[in-house]
Swiss-Prot record:
Domain EngA-type G: 3-167, 184-359
Name this polypeptide is given: GTPase Der
InterPro entries attached to this UniProt entry: G_ENGA, GTP-bd, GTPase_Der, KH_dom-like, KH_dom-like_a/b, P-loop_NTPase, Small_GTP-bd
Species this protein is from: Nitrobacter winogradskyi (strain ATCC 25391 / DSM 10237 / CIP 104748 / NCIMB 11846 / Nb-255)
Family, per entry: Belongs to the TRAFAC class TrmE-Era-EngA-EngB-Septin-like GTPase superfamily. EngA (Der) GTPase family.
Top-rank lineage group of the source organism: Bacteria
Function in brief: GTPase that plays an essential role in the late steps of ribosome biogenesis.
Stored Gene3D superfamilies: 3.30.300.20, P-loop containing nucleotide triphosphate hydrolases (3.40.50.300)
Length: 455
């Protein structure tokens, strides 16, 4: 029997748009007016290799008994009862409303797995609403734009976590690698005139993108599809990123915003540098942006054909990356020439490797064996004479690898100790160059309320 997921939420948050996106057809009417959907509608959805039944529901809204609104809610309740899991959708741009909070309680009472979806997350305006949603207690929000087909890979990860595992068992002693048959979305970014378009033209074997010695030739984020040695890629060429103080024209500001969106919705990002220029603060800012967005990073040093004594230059760049960007220590640095093709094969291999690391999941038994050894080798410092207890760790998601450490006092664990855990994780499981997220969470103390009563 097919796994069934009901899409729920208040009116006009984009449930029907998401439904249409998942089923691949415009089966549900979509309009800006709230309440267009009245009956529940079922469809067969496919996302990556996930096949499931999805139910579109009316917006959860209360009304008098017997009214149309009340009957719409009954239809929604029937869909929830029939579902194996729920997708709770809210509008990230509008933020949480009292109705969202009310029906988040409703979703919790259903006692079914819930995937929290922050729809309309395109651009920067959805960030605040997404962060606000942590207060609902329904887990990490998945930022998507159903209308623009953005964030679907993150939604895939979230749905995969609540759906039954395939019949084939994974050896718990193995590190789980991703399915490499899907196209890799790659954004190529960097300062103006680093040769981004020239590299893509070489890969395509045609003058697909305009190139010029003049900086700023590329304005839009242009996407192209290519197959390299049997592997599919979707590559986004982007406008060069200059320091904010140098950006004056409105068109350039729009180009920069377009580039930032390309980074946000890419899976791997190539930071292109000109070999003739020094590693500058703007390169660091771009790399830091890529890390904050949680994307796999490869650094490509272009125009290598113009350089002499190159091996020392590459070694120096690698040292600079590890020194200035310890949060992505070990990011691959590849020397290339978009004009002659030198190093292009190495670049494509580095992208695939970085993508695989970014997707990596570590088996729980293997993870906790590392965790016990890491804590035993270097226990966390005591705070005010009290020992901090770190209980266990679990991986919550990949893309990038994200972990939760359960402990006695989350607020007392110093940042330096978190960096120690990140570096140890990176070294033990060969996670070089990918962002690693560690969140601290306190284990509930069953006796806390009793102590409060006595005081």
């Amino acid at each position: 029997m097919s796994f069934t997921i009901a899409i729920i939420g208040r009116p006009n948050v984009g449930k029907s748009t998401l439904f249409n996106r998942l089923v691949g057809q415009k089966l549900a009417l979509v309009d800006d007016e709230p309440g267009v959907t009245r009956d529940r509608r079922e469809g067969q959805a496919r996302l990556g290799d996930l096949d499931f039944t999805v139910i579109d529901t009316a917006g959860l809204d209360e009304g008098p008994r017997g009214s149309l609104t009340a009957r719409m809610q009954e239809q929604t309740e029937a869909a929830i009862a029939a579902a194996d899991a729920l997708m709770f959708v809210f509008d990230a741009r509008a933020g949480l409303t009292p109705t969202d909070r009310s029906f988040a309680d409703f979703a919790r009472r259903a006692d079914k797995p819930v995937v929290l979806v922050a729809n309309k997350s395109e651009g920067r305006h959805g960030d605040a609403g997404a962060l606000e949603s942590y207060a609902l207690g329904l887990g990490d929000p998945v930022g998507v734009s159903a209308e623009h087909d953005e964030g679907m890979s993150d939604l895939y990860d979230a749905l995969r976590s609540v759906m039954p595992e395939p019949a084939e068992e994974v050896d718990e002693e193995e590190i789980v690698e991703p399915d490499m048959s899907r196209p890799i979305r790659v954004a190529i970014v960097g300062r103006p005139n680093a040769g981004k378009s020239t590299v893509i033209n070489y890969l395509l074997s045609e003058e697909r993108l305009l190139t010029s010695p003049e900086a700023g030739t590329t304005r839009d984020s242009i996407s192209v599809e290519l197959n390299w040695k049997g592997r599919d890629f979707r590559i986004f060429d982007t406008a060069g990123l200059r320091r904010r103080s140098r950006i004056e024209a409105k068109l350039e500001k729009l180009s920069v915003a377009d580039t930032l969106r390309a980074v946000r919705f890419a899976e791997a990002v190539v930071l292109m540098m000109d070999a003739q220029n020094r590693f500058e603060e703007q390169d660091l800012r771009i790399a830091d942006l890529i890390e904050r967005e949680g994307r796999a990073l490869v650094i490509a040093v272009n125009k290598w054909d113009l350089m002499k004594g190159g091996s020392a230059r590459i070694a120096s760049l690698r040292n600079d990356v590890d020194h200035w960007l310890p949060q992505i220590r070990g990011a691959p640095v590849v020397a290339i020439s978009g004009l002659t093709g030198e190093g292009i094969d190495r670049l494509m291999i580095a992208i695939q490797t970085a993508y695989a690391v970014w997707n990596r999941r570590v088996a729980t038994a293997l993870l906790n064996r590392w965790f016990q050894q890491a804590v035993a080798a270097s226990p966390p410092p005591a705070v005010s004479g009290r020992r901090l207890k770190l209980n266990y760790a679990t991986q919550t998601k990949a893309r990038p690898p994200s972990f939760v450490v359960f402990c006695s006092r989350a607020d007392a664990v110093p940042e330096s100790y978190l960096r120690y855990l990140v570096n140890s994780l990176r070294e033990t499981f060969d996670l070089a160059g990918t962002p690693i997220r560690i969140t601290l969470r306190e284990k509930a103390n069953p006796f806390a309320h009793k102590r409060k009563r006595k005081s």
